[in-house]
């Protein structure tokens, strides 16, 4: 299993003066962090946590243990800054992380009330449990979900990065099947939109995840936009569905002889200087794969390949 598409968006909202959210959308690593603290401390906390997470990915173990290790490393980074910088005293951040493995699973790590969801066959499932006061009261049966949504302390969280030297991290793995769409988001989205609305907006925009991210943010702002809003989206597909051989129909170019015609069944036969840029040694068929192309979109590769091919063919035709 591999990430097929990904997109992200963030917005200050309609009530806040600055955006204290940070996010990572760098397959196979995805994350959302919602900072808190006076002045610019919240923004600093979330950005520090995101930076530490990126650094920790390179050396962390695999699976749930690795995700916990990464998040605890981010916690230490934020806590150290809060203890040594008077202007950052009391700062903290939520953190929700998703890492896509090749074993048909997505590993989630979670601290705070930023959430992870999975959309499968039109059904939206909340994967994480909020670490918040009202969520705890709901779990104890002291509040109903409806009461929690309007409770005056609904934004009070019970866990965060940076507030203590260590932190409890919830980590687990979920199954991923082709077509699943995963959403990570800050509470600026979920306090404005219920699960039914989120599922409906996603369902209308599944063909374009960039549009889906923008649509979710716009919907939250339409409902009031009381907080910063961040969305990170990705979907997964089987590796065989992503890696594919690129076949280009024969092209007619001025000055090109019949014997030079490109035959689709043979793949694309390119001049050596162009071939080397797109295919593995020993192959004459261009195979596009997200891994060697450093996550470049397949559509952009196709355009670049066609443009380069046409230039070479025209140049050869004019030279005759």
Where are these regions (language model features)?
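PP2C/PPM-type serine/threonine phosphatase catalytic domain
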Residues: 1-320
């Amino acid at each position: 299993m591999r990430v097929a598409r990904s997109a992200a968006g963030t917005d200050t909202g309609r009530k806040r003066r600055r955006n204290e959210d940070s996010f990572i959308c760098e397959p196979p690593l995805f994350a959302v962090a919602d900072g808190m603290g006076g002045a610019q401390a919240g923004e600093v906390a979330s950005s520090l946590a995101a930076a530490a997470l990126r650094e920790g990915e390179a050396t962390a173990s695999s699976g749930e243990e690795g995700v916990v290790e990464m998040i605890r490393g981010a916690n230490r980074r934020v806590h150290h800054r809060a203890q040594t910088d008077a202007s950052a005293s009391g700062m903290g951040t939520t953190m929700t992380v998703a890492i896509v493995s090749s074993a048909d699973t997505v590993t989630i790590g979670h601290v705070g009330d930023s959430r992870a969801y999975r959309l499968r066959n039109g059904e939206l499932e909340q994967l994480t449990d909020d670490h918040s006061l009202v969520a705890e009261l709901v779990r104890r049966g002291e509040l109903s979900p409806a009461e929690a949504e309007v409770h005056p302390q609904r934004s009070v969280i019970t866990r965060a990065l940076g507030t203590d030297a260590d932190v409890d991290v919830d980590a687990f793995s979920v199954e991923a099947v082709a077509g699943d769409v995963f959403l990570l988001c800050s509470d600026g989205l979920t306090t404005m939109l219920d699960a039914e609305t989120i599922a409906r907006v996603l369902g209308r925009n599944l063909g374009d995840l960039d549009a889906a991210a923008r649509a979710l943010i716009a919907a939250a702002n339409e409902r009031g936009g009381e907080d910063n809003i961040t969305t990170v989206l990705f979907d997964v597909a089987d590796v065989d569905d992503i890696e594919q051989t690129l076949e280009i129909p024969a092209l007619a170019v001025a000055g090109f002889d019949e014997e030079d015609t490109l035959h689709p069944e043979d793949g694309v036969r390119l001049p050596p200087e162009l071939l080397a840029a797109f295919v593995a040694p020993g192959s004459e068929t261009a195979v596009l794969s997200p891994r060697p192309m450093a996550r470049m979109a397949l559509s952009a590769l196709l355009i670049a390949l066609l443009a380069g091919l046409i230039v070479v063919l025209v140049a050869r035709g004019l030279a005759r």
